A protein has these predicted regions:
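N-terminal nicking endonuclease/strand-transfer module with a His-rich metal-binding environment
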Residues: 1-204
Length: 204
């Protein structure tokens, strides 16, 4: 079972990529992969593509989170699924970085991809239909890997932390408080605090 969520990145693409590539979260970057870019230079690679884009949009990249139910998938398999999801969704047109965070009780993937494609330099259109497409692809991959799938409608409208608390039995308010405290301690600016909270799946 995997929960998916996506949001746009309008600034600090480099900080977002640095966060998802954190060695402490990715087993010293063992679970970091990329396509049509290097994780170390992805922000610059994205900018080069965006500079040639025809559309004027504030969205520089998109951050997709794919979180699995605790204990259902190994680190290695989760990372494979993340790469497969990125490949199926982006069809070889967009540069991306995919990482798997293994430092908590729930394994989850982070996929950050450039908002403009490398071929025609058109922008990715984020809408309700595109999100449903992401969820459909994720569910199909879960089935292929013999993982459970979220029952349609059963999780509708739930935020990421609410879904997660249902999976591991933790109190969602306590978890939110912990996440806020962690991000406050880790961030040096308010913008960075917002970035860290969004990376954890919160809508702000």
């Amino acid at each position: 079972m995997a929960y998916t969520k996506i949001h746009a990145i309008k600034a600090t693409v480099d900080k977002a990529i640095d966060y998802i590539c954190n060695p402490e979260k990715t087993d010293e970057k063992m679970f970091v992969s990329s396509y049509a870019c290097s994780p170390e230079t992805a922000a610059y690679d994205f900018k080069y593509t965006l500079d040639h884009c025809r559309e004027n949009s504030p969205n520089k990249a998109y951050h997709l989170i794919q979180a699995f139910a605790p204990g259902e998938v190994s680190f290695e398999e989760a990372h494979r699924i993340g790469k497969e999801l990125a490949d199926k969704l982006l069809e070889g047109k967009y540069s991306y970085v995919v990482t798997t965070h293994i430092d908590k009780g729930h394994v989850h993937n982070h996929i950050i991809f450039c908002s403009a494609d490398n071929i025609e330099h058109n922008k990715y259109h984020d809408c309700k239909q595109s999100y449903y497409h992401i969820r459909k692809l994720s569910d199909e991959l879960c089935k292929e890997h013999n993982l459970s799938v979220i029952i349609p409608g059963a999780q509708r409208g739930k935020k990421y932390k609410e879904w997660q608390s249902n999976q591991n039995g933790s109190a969602w308010k306590t978890q939110i408080r912990k996440d806020i405290n962690f991000c406050i301690k880790s961030a040096s600016t308010y913008e960075e605090f917002l970035l860290l909270m969004r990376a954890k799946g919160y809508e702000i």
